[in-house]
């Protein structure tokens, strides 16, 4: 079977995607699969470079990769691919939409407002959220252009900076607590990982620099584990995820979990969280890649 490992892309997360692709190529079972690296430099590459492959193993992150666009193209070309479908990918990439779906399903997430380019900033609504707030691109990833804002005078600059990366910007109540990530694979939660960043929050540097954060598999207290698992699985289901995704949460000092966001194509670098979680179940990286390929092939699209 000829596997195209699709990486690169045109988003702000291109370099991380290339790292994910490289790690996958290094660890995939080459006795079982013929592997073709496919680097996307421009949008039409997904059509021109995917010809002749039997399966697309997606290592893309961010817009045009994680937002359902590439998934739709591959589906149109009749090429099976890894992970979530177009609708789920698009919903999870758009934090305003995903949070609206969560809220409609009674799943706890921080209150927020969403701005489009040209909208006036409603400072009264921001005051209702209460400072500090988080300002970030609505369709962003890897915490690029994400700011914790503690007072009103900082808002305009941070919103302007976030708009450099996206056509929409989210302003969300900052929830103080411990960040955890909950990988979900085929409707089952894998071991939870606690994230203790050296910075104020789990920013770009913390995520991708060696030693930027301490990431450890944790055993949560029984009641909290039960609630976290319920929320992770309900989120996976509500947003129509398939095969695997990563549900990120924040747990307050009082032990109340909130959904932060959902990653439909989580990182697959040596520092990445899903391989760490799978390793806690004695599932090696090569085996995990094989599972993702085989389970994705079972989906009828």
From Swiss-Prot:
The keyword Transmembrane helix does not apply. One of its GO terms (biological process) is cell wall organization. It is found in: Cytoplasm. Pathway: Cell wall biogenesis; peptidoglycan biosynthesis. Binds 2 magnesium or manganese ions per subunit. Its cofactor is Mg(2+); Mn(2+). Keywords: ATP-binding, Cell shape, Cell wall biogenesis/degradation, Cytoplasm, Ligase, Magnesium, Manganese, Metal-binding, Nucleotide-binding, Peptidoglycan synthesis. GO terms for cellular component: cytoplasm. ATP binds at residues 126-181. Pfam families: Dala_Dala_lig_C, Dala_Dala_lig_N. It catalyses: 2 D-alanine + ATP = D-alanyl-D-alanine + ADP + phosphate + H(+). GO terms for molecular function: ATP binding; D-alanine-D-alanine ligase activity; metal ion binding. Mg(2+) 1 binds at residues 248, 261. InterPro entries: ATP-grasp, ATP_grasp_subdomain_1, D-Ala_lig_Van_CS, D_ala_D_ala, Dala_Dala_lig_C, Dala_Dala_lig_N, PreATP-grasp_dom_sf. Mg(2+) 2 binds at residues 261, 263. It is an enzyme of class 6 (ligase). Residues 99-294 form the ATP-grasp domain. Belongs to the D-alanine--D-alanine ligase family. Cell wall formation. PANTHER family: D-ALANINE--D-ALANINE LIGASE, D-ALANINE--D-ALANINE LIGASE B. This is D-alanine--D-alanine ligase. It comes from Clostridium beijerinckii (strain ATCC 51743 / NCIMB 8052) (Clostridium acetobutylicum). The gene is ddl.
């Amino acid at each position: 079977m000829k596997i195209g490992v699709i990486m690169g892309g045109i988003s702000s997360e291109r370099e991380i995607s290339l790292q994910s692709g490289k790690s996958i190529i290094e660890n995939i079972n080459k006795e079982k699969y013929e592997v073709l690296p496919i680097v996307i430099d421009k949008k039409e590459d997904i059509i021109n470079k995917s010809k002749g492959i039997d399966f697309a193993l997606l290592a893309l992150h961010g817009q045009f990769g994680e937002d359902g666009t590439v998934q739709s193209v591959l589906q149109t070309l009749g090429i099976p691919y890894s992970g979530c479908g177009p609708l789920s990918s698009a919903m999870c990439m758009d934090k305003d939409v995903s949070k609206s779906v969560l809220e409609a399903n009674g799943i706890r997430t921080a209150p927020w407002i969403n701005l489009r380019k040209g909208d006036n900033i409603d400072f009264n609504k921001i005051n209702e959220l209460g400072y500090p707030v988080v300002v970030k691109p609505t369709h962003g990833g890897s915490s690029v252009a994400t700011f914790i804002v503690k007072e009103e005078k900082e808002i305009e600059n941070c919103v302007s900076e976030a708009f450099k990366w996206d056509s929409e910007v989210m302003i969300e109540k900052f929830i103080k607590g411990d960040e955890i990530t909950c990988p979900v694979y085929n409707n089952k939660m894998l071991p939870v990982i606690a994230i203790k960043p050296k910075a104020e929050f789990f920013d770009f540097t913390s995520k991708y620099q060696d030693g930027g954060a301490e990431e450890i598999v944790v055993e949560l207290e029984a009641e909290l584990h039960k609630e976290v698992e319920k929320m992770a699985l309900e989120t996976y289901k509500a947003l129509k995820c398939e095969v695997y995704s990563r549900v990120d949460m924040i747990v307050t000092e009082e032990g109340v979990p909130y959904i932060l966001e959902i990653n439909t194509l989580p990182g697959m670098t040596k520092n990445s969280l899903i391989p760490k979680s799978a390793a806690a179940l004695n599932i090696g990286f090569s085996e995990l890649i094989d599972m993702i390929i085989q389970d994705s092939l079972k989906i009828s699209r």
